[in-house]
Amino acid sequence: MVRSLNNMSRKRIGALIVFERRTGLADVIDSGTVIDGEISAPLIENIFEPNTPLHDGAVIVRGERIVAAACILQLTDDHSLSRELGTRHRAAIGITESTDAVSIIVSEETGIISMARDGKLTRYLDTKSLNILLTELFMPDDLPPAWLSSRSSLFGARAVKQKEDGDEE
């Protein structure tokens, strides 16, 4: 995931990826095209390739799968946002205001990678901070071990084992 975000950032390919958490996103998924594919850099980069049918709109990720692409999101009503933030950023913030989803945005104009969570935007994420944020976000203490263990291939088995055992190895 992080590799594909960095590749798109470097090439200035805009992207919006929404990670479903506890709040279901069925209505949003229904607005797009069903994909149901395993997360991979080539798939993500192909979806967001400019001038292709799926590149507009958001990709929705559930667990370790891309469930839909070209999904329509409601924009935030926050009029205090900087004018330099476009529709992609406003949509990313909007979905996180009404759900517990987390959105990752790659700016088409600047290549800047940002994250929206709880209606707030964090900009200028580099590879290290993106890895840390995604790992922390998807390995919280209050989720059952079965959910965590399904993340091992996405974030690394060692990180999942440490979180489950509660100690550092």
Regions found by a protein language model. Give the residues of each.
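Divalent-cation
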Residues: 1-169
